[in-house]
Amino acid sequence: MTSTQAIFEKVQKVKKTINTATTAEKNHALEEMAKQLWLSRTDILAANELDMTTAKGKISDVMLDRLYLDEERIAAMAEGIRQLIDLEDPVGQVLERTELDNGLVISKKRVAMGVIGIIYESRPNVTSDAAALALKSGSAVVLRSGKDAYQTALAIVTALKEGLAQTKISPDCIQLVSDTSRASAQAMMKAKGYLDLLIPRGGAGLIQAVVENATVPVIETGTGIVHVYVDKDADQDKALAIIENAKTSRPSVCNAMEVLLVHEEIAERFLPRLQKMLVTDRVAAQEKTIELRLDEKAAQYISGSQARPEDFDTEFLDYVLAVKLVSSLEEAVEHIEAHSTHHSDAIVTENDSAAAYFTEQVDSAAVYVNASTRFTDGGQFGLGCEMGISTQKLHARGPMGLKELTSYKYVIQGTGQVRK
């Protein structure tokens, strides 16, 4: 087992091969990585089967779905890498250029971050996405997977490094920490001087631990207590379609809806239709039903479990939905501001004034009008694969693509000027 410190030192020695790589060299590397990922699919699937076997009975079915890989998902991972080839290289872009009265020309230039650390849980695609994004944005990467997905992550990293071996960029620019204990996570949090940025991707406990304990700069990828508010002026057919997609298409992801707010004026007609869609129709289709956790007002119209106060502060990542009735748009916004993690929140309404009020007042990274929250995703936003969804305001907010993984410096060109 290679120590975490040894990994930090190794990546420092080779980071210049990626920090200074040309766009053509990086794109060639991405193509080779994508190619080798697909060619190694048999090994990756075998490793994933080991992880799945070990994890069964220890994590929920929804979390098992996050961990599971098949050829289709590996193909999507490879395609995600290739999509970055077509995106503009942010490194070297001149953001601003100013000529002063004294003749100095000051340029603000985008540069690589250096070395990026990622601590994540049971998401195999994060391994390939993070490595590819770091590479295209000019940085080396140190990956620390959760133990549930370690064998899969190792097989993926092995394939990516085999791809890099065919290029001018050192394979050691991608490092996977073999120690999945808390000690390695702590080492990454304290790796000042080795990591230029640390990004946690996972549950609330992991993210909170990193934010509270790290001495290196951190971008917080928040949990998703995601709300959909159905206004009294909503198109109810549209609302039901949005809710079905936001809750059932993939409940285990951070942009899935967890809380439904409904204006009480439409509850009598709307809630029975909601229950039919999420429960009755799914029973008939032999699909997993949604457990509805209802506040007292909602329970007057449909049946379900009684909602506890903490249900409105929980990222279920499962087939569970908390439902609350509100008396006004203002009450809906107040509830969201009190309980949201500022990830993604949506309003369904045909009232332009209500939509404008919602988008101005809700302080989340992504605010939707008449659309599913499942679109909060780098690929859907045209950014390619993403490093995560930032819920903070400094440096990056929302889906983090290539530009969000860079920094900048000032280049000052003179002709001999001295300060008087």
Swiss-Prot record:
Pfam families: Aldedh
Keyword vocabulary terms for this entry: Amino-acid biosynthesis, Cytoplasm, NADP, Oxidoreductase, Proline biosynthesis
GO molecular function, one term: NADP binding
Main location: cytoplasm
Gene3D superfamilies assigned: Aldehyde Dehydrogenase, Chain A, domain 1, Aldehyde Dehydrogenase, Chain A, domain 2
Catalytic activity: L-glutamate 5-semialdehyde + phosphate + NADP(+) = L-glutamyl 5-phosphate + NADPH + H(+)
EC numbers on record: 1.2.1.41
Superkingdom classification of source: Bacteria
Localisation: Cytoplasm
UniProt pathway annotation: Amino-acid biosynthesis; L-proline biosynthesis; L-glutamate 5-semialdehyde from L-glutamate: step 2/2
Alphabetized InterPro entries for the sequence: Ald_DH/histidinol_DH, Ald_DH_C, Ald_DH_N, Aldehyde_DH_dom, G-glutamylP_reductase_CS, Glu-5-SA_DH, GPR_dom
Gene Ontology biological process terms from the UniProt entry: L-proline biosynthetic process
Lipid metabolism among keywords: no
GO CC entries: cytoplasm
NCBIfam families, per database record: PRK00197.1, proA
Family: Belongs to the gamma-glutamyl phosphate reductase family.
Record-linked HAMAP family: ProA
Function: Catalyzes the NADPH-dependent reduction of L-glutamate 5-phosphate into L-glutamate 5-semialdehyde and phosphate. The product spontaneously undergoes cyclization to form 1-pyrroline-5-carboxylate.
Protein name: Gamma-glutamyl phosphate reductase
Organism: Streptococcus sanguinis (strain SK36)
Taxonomic placement: Bacteria, Bacillati, Bacillota, Bacilli, Lactobacillales
